[in-house]
Amino acid sequence: LAGQLHGFVLFGAPLAAGSVSAVLMLSFAAPILQRVPPLRVLVLATLLYVVGAVLATAAPAMGWVLGGTVIRGVAAGLLAGFGLGAIGALFDERERPRVFGLYALIWLLPSVVGPPLNALITDWVGWRWAIGWPAVLVVIGRAMIGRTVSAVPWQPVTGRAGVRIVVGGGVAFALALGSWGSADPSVWGLVALVLGLGTGGAAIALCLIRGLPRNPRPLLAFAVLCAAFFGAFELLSLALIEGLGSTVLVAAGAVTGGLTAWSLVGLRPRPGGRPDPAVLGPGLVLIACVMLLAGMALAGLAGVWTIIAGAIVAGVGMGAAYPLLSSEPFSDDAAPVTVGTLIAFAETAATAWVALLAGGLYSALHGRGWQPNRALELVFALLAVLAATAVAISAGRRTPRRATDAK
């Protein structure tokens, strides 16, 4: 794509632009969702996605691809806030964990089938079709949703929204700064990467705490859990292929195994279970990060199998904790649309931030002469620290049951 459009200077920008624009959109999506009826939101998000897809598909230059990616990111942020808010409004606290468990299963198929299918389409008819064809499925799916969207309870609200544009914009700016820094091999690039990671992480935490000031721990634990899990999966294929000399097929199998474990375990959430699944899940992700470290140290076939097993353990942990930690914030008295936007912001921002941490730090270290295995080991160690942090935050959270017992 970059070669055909003579746009290698902008090659890295579209990779980060979608996440950054989605984070920025989510920082002020709540007031929009509070004032605009659901059907109009659905239509607007769909139109934005189609416009972005058309711009990228018909791009005569790399700047058009960047613009289309930004617009699709805005559409994704708007719809993510709407969708999670709708779950909070339609289902009670007993049903929500089950719904969020199904939510993970729904995107499993696109996550597994999408990349190889797009690779085949690109090889067969070119990258423009690979970018454009999903828009057809999006329009069909949104049309089906539109037939039942009137079931979502909605009343216009004029009160204060959960995420503030100033802080949310700061998150987007920090991610953009860090993305630029990760692509710059100079000392200033490294400074920008570290600065973007530090300020971005602090701004994300500030957004979530301000959004639900009375009980932010479930939301914070959810964000840190997403960062630890998706950070590990960000480098899983790289660890197997570059670090251990395995094949693309093995790497794809490891990713698929982890995502499948997440989806299957998530189908049977255990609210109130012992041990607490919302604490056990991050604990399993921590164990998985240690297994990834061990796999890099073992090398050979033993290392490959250790990393594959670690991916599955991480998936089991995510399946245990994700449905609970993503549904518990709705126990707050805030409007469902506000809470849904905060949950979407937490996952999207944390995933973008950890992609910068994992991918950006690995690139920076590798570019400065580090061996791939040593660079991967350092990143996996940092991800283990994140998983341990998620365990600590989740263990100290105030669940609805604990709140009831205290009364």
Model regions and ranges:
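Helix-terminus/helix-capping segments at the ends of transmembrane helices and short amphipathic helices
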Residues: A2, L84-D92, G101, I106, ...
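Interfacial loop-to-helix junctions that mark the boundaries of transmembrane helices
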Residues: V9-F11, V65-G68, V125-G126, T158-R160, ...
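12-transmembrane solute porter fold
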Residues: V9-Q34, L39, L47, G52, ...
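Helix-loop-helix hairpins in multi-pass membrane proteins, especially solute transporters
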Residues: V23, A29-A30, Q34-T158, G359
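Alpha-helical transmembrane segments
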Residues: A45-Y49, L109-S111, R164-L175, V285-A288
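Membrane-interface helix caps and helix-loop-helix hairpins in membrane proteins
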Residues: M62, W180-P185, P271, G300-L301
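Hydrophobic transmembrane-helix bundles of small-molecule transporters
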Residues: A119, D123-L236
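Short, Lys/Arg-enriched, Gly/Pro-containing loop segments at transmembrane-helix junctions
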Residues: P153-T158, S331, T399-K407
